[in-house]
């Protein structure tokens, strides 16, 4: 309440304060969606029950801060964080860990929390006011798997997908060498690796993005009609050795190893498209993680 004895100076200051509160900038700030609200909206739209035990949690930053933009990525490397910050995006949604372990726990580092690389990354996050949230488990849990949808679309294999098994495909016949070249071109991979006869004819294959594990990978190779497994990454003394032995035994089997990031990257590009269908208050952009590997020309 303003008294009739209030001085003109105080009235002016009050008027200025009200004008400031009603200014477009302040009004826009007050209506801007927070990081927590973004996640709550995702939980409501993802279409699968939310797990109590999950890695899909905030990894850094204050969930209550207003979001200026959302950067969606496969992996929140420092390079990705720098590009997100430079473009004015303060919420980073990442599929893979930010701090070097599946649980984002630095206990595996010899220096733990005192590790210099970890400290520099955390300092950058804090200095630029970034919020990092992981979206891994529930994006995979969707039916069909969100990562798989994006990868199949990027490879142009939608029409070849087995209706009974989303990970199996019947493609027009191609040699292993030609198919590997085509995949490398479509996914822009410079360091793809192949196991098997380059001239082997391929028609039936399985796609296993990321690191699905020895049991899943050999399960695919054990299927009598599967000639090729396209996968993200694996231990060489597990699936690679298994495939090599199968080939030596005379079985027509092959591997194309994409690398973890390129094997799922298009799945997070698909996630970006999906997020845009129900988040329109702020920009939502895909920030691809760069593949750090390169190979010398022999």
Enumerate the predicted regions with their spans.
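Bacterial N-terminal signal peptides
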Residues: 12-23
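Hydrophobic structural segments
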Residues: 2, 8, 18, 27-298
